[in-house]
Amino acid sequence: MAGAKEIKTKIASVQSTQKITKAMEMVATSKMRKTQDRMAASRPYSETIRNVISHVSKASIGYKHPFLVEREVKKIGILVISTDRGMCGGLNVNLFKTILNQIKNWKEQNISTDLGLIGSKGISFFRSFGFNIKGQLSGLGDMPALEELIGVANTMFDAYRNGEIDAVYIAYNKFVNTMSQKPVVQQLVPLPESKDDHLNERQQTWDYLYEPEPKVLLDSLLVRYLESQIYQAVVDNLASEQAARMVAMKAATDNAGNLINDLRLVYNKARQASITNELNEIVAGAAAI
C-alpha cells in the first residue's frame, strides 16, 4: 500500500484537475446558452427567405435558376462542419461515421464525392482518407462570421455551376437538446422542396409585386438563403459542441469526485495502519523494558 504522504499528493492532484474540469463545464454552459440565442435568432430569417423563394419560383416568370434544376448525379460535394477543439465526447466521431457511411452508399451507386471542410478536426480526419478537398477553413472561434464562411461555400457552389459536381450537401451536428446532438447530412443544392412548398402552391402567384424583377430577386435570395443555411449549420454545430463539452466535463468532474473519495478511503486506511504499527512498536518496547 502506498504511503499516506503519497496518497495525499495524489488527492491534491485530482482536486486540481477537478477544479479545471468544473471551470470548463461552466464555461461550456455559458457559451452554449449564448449560441442557442444566436441559433434561435437566425431561424426566422432563413425560413422567411425560403418561403419567398418558393413563391417566386412558382410564379410564371419563365426562368429556372441553376440551383433549382435537378440533374443526373455523378459527383456530390459535401460541406463538412466539425469542431476546431476536442474534449467534446464522441461528437466529431459520430459525424464522421455518418458521412463515411453516406459516401459508401453513394460509391455503390457509382457516385464520387468532393469535400469542403470547416473545422480542424474534420481537416485532419479526412486528409488521411485521400479525398479530393476543394476548400478548407479552421479557427472560426466561438462567434463565427458569415464573411469567413463564404470562401469555402463559394468553392462548392462554383463547382456546381461549372458542372464539376451535381449536388451540394452539408454535414453537421444538429442541436436537439443539451443531452442530444444528431449528425445530419442534408441537401443544399439543388434546393429540395420544403413542406411549405405544397402550401404555397395553393396560393395565387399574382398577389405580389416584386422590386426588383422576379429573376433578379430570385438570384439574390437563393444566394442569401444558402448562406443563411450554412451559417445556421455552423451555429448548430457550435451549440452541439458546447453541449457535448459541458456533458463531458461534468462526467469528468463527477469521476474526479469519486476518485477523490476512493483515495481518501485508502489514505485513511494507510493512516490507520501507520498508527497501529506505531502503537505495536510502543507496546513491544514497553514489554521489553
Curated annotation (Swiss-Prot):
CDD domains given in the database record? F1-ATPase_gamma
Pfam families registered for this protein in UniProt: ATP-synt
A GO biological process held by the record: proton motive force-driven plasma membrane ATP synthesis
SUPFAM superfamilies tied to this protein = ATP synthase (F1-ATPase), gamma subunit
Look up keyword rRNA processing and say if it applies. Answer: no
Sorted keywords for this record are:
ATP synthesis, Cell inner membrane, Cell membrane, CF(1), Hydrogen ion transport, Ion transport, Membrane, Transport
Membrane topology value: Peripheral membrane protein
- Molecular function as annotated in GO: ATP binding; proton-transporting ATP synthase activity, rotational mechanism
- Listed GO CC annotations: plasma membrane; proton-transporting ATP synthase complex
Q: Quote the Gene3D superfamilies the UniProt record gives.
A: 3.40.1380.10, ATP synthase, gamma subunit, helix hairpin domain
Cellular location(s) = Cell inner membrane
Q: Which family does it belong to?
A: Belongs to the ATPase gamma chain family.
| Functional description taken from the UniProt entry | Produces ATP from ADP in the presence of a proton gradient across the membrane. The gamma chain is believed to be important in regulating ATPase activity and the flow of protons through the CF(0) complex.
Tell me which HAMAP family the record gives: ATP_synth_gamma_bact
Q: What is this protein called?
A: ATP synthase gamma chain
Name its species: Haemophilus influenzae (strain PittGG)
Organism lineage reads as: Bacteria, Pseudomonadati, Pseudomonadota, Gammaproteobacteria, Pasteurellales
